[in-house]
Amino acid sequence: YDLITTIIKTMKKLKILLFLCVVACTLTVQAQKQFTLNSPDGKLQTTITVGDKLTYDIHCDGRQILAPSPISMTLENGEVWGEKAKLAGTSGKKVDQMVPSPFYRANELRDYYNELTLRFKKDWNVEFRAYNDGIAYRFVSRSKKPFNVVDETVDYRFPSDMVASVPYVKAGKDGDYESQYFNSFENTYTTDRLSKLNKKRLMFLPLVVDAGEGVKICITESGLENYPGLYLSAAEGENRLTGQFAPYPKKTVQGGHNQLQMLVKEHEAYIA
């Protein structure tokens, strides 16, 4: 009788444990939310996942050309935009307008895209745009209080060992990224597989990754103001390119070519 009682008690415990496991797994799945944004012509698609991390991927004509890649921004107060983020709401819109371009070969350009804005608690947003020829995103603060950005996570993860054409920074020592931040942004392009890129050298933008079947991914940025430009580095043993950012200058002295440059002697513990 005691043995049967023990077995029954054990089975009850197992049922409770199994129930808790099922509940925990269900909550984990439910905690992740996915949003899909398509380009106006429907050929490009990005799926944004909100969970423990904030990630996005890119499909072109139904084929994945960028695997789920995490993005985040770390503030000086320790807050991280993009990790365990609490979604507050979403909104979307379609934009189709002409933009004046006095310094281009045409006097105006068509600005045509679909946009998805994810609003999070703690006063920040992420805006995604899907154009017919590209996907873009940016972080936006809703707070009126000033803040410093300590770091930003940019981590391009590719589904295979693709071929990339990249411009390496020529200046500075191998493996010493800080010494490479001071450069002229001039070099020829080197073409190789992601796994064979030089991991000791920074790469500047734009750079191109060949996704095959006539599709090429050009990585670049625009609308940059009061923020460091993005460098990329090759991650060890993986089909990844990770972001590197120069820290904000604290002390500068005049020097360089014909004393025309400001040389950074000390930097702050933040990037912007």
Which ranges hold each PLM region?
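Bacterial Sec-dependent N-terminal signal peptides
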Residues: 1-34
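N-terminal accessory beta-strand-rich subdomains and adjacent acidic, glycine-rich linkers
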Residues: 34-272
